[in-house]
Amino acid sequence: MGIFAQDVVADNMLLFQRDNGGWPKHYLNKKINYTTIFSEAEKATIKDEENRNDATIDNEATTKEIRYLLNIYKKLGTQKYFKAAEKGIDYLLTAQYKNGGWPQFYPDLSSYRHLITYNDNAMINALNVLQDIVEHKNDFDIVNPKYTEKATLAVQ
């Protein structure tokens, strides 16, 4: 196990992660299926989109990936999964508005995307991730302790 242990779903999550730390909810206008075995050409196309502004918390995007990556890191010990999960946590903390809400998409705040998102449990899912950091539970006991104070402030 360790550095060379791999998980197809986790590797695909890393492939889709945006530079800002979040994840999109769609690929080719469909919900991302992380169990897909992508060709090298498809992987290159997906990787070329890593700087897009389409990261979101809608439809469990970003929060689902953070949770999965921490869980698989605990099982396999593969550091890249842990780093990607923490980058996702950074995304949640950065995207949060001062009033406590989150836009549906970040950093793309055009159109309705800047509005605080209550549908699909988007905000609840983000808050639950941060609360799990505060309480050190559901695999969040392993994240860097620096996140505890930030998450505490974010959920107040």
Question: Where are these predicted regions, by residue range?
Answer:
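Short amphipathic alpha-helical molecular recognition features
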Residues: G2, I57, Y73, G77-K80, ...
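Long, well-ordered core segments of solenoidal/helical folds
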Residues: V8-G21, A84-G101, K150-Q156
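Glycine- and aromatic-rich loop/turn segments at beta-sheet edges
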Residues: Q17-N51, A95-H114
